[in-house]
Amino acid sequence: MLGRHPKALRRLGILFAGGRVEKVYWAVVEGRPPEAKGRIETGLKKLTRGTGWHMVVDPVGQKAITDYRVCGLGDGRAWLELRPRTGRTHQLRVHCAAIGCPVVGDAVYGNPASGESLQLYARSITLPLYPARAPLEITAPVPPHMRAALQRLGHHEVVAS
């Protein structure tokens, strides 16, 4: 997200830091969450080993909260709408894995042998830029690598050619 001038950048920074920016992600995950909608609330901690690192669920780690909603089911997979309430590194991927539904194509927190592309993307962002105006909502189209999977789960989006 870019601002045209320092004042705009400061305002955007305040919105993000204050949790006033609404972010929505879509994911195709393995399995089915325990409920049609819910909240995942865990601590997350960075674990460094050998040549790499990854995040793990840890009760004394940084607080991380994600709300989810199931949008479609089929073929042993689910289409989830994810709304992070905090902004931790790899939060959505770790949270999906923590409820037994790793993101399809996630070689770190899911099945490294699947060979599929990561099925997670930022669907929309809503910015309350001005108090007297409606928030600005920006929605991204479904990326090409996710279209077929989402269609199998019930999503139908007209794609401009």
Where are these regions (language model features)?
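RNA pseudouridine synthases
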Residues: 2-161
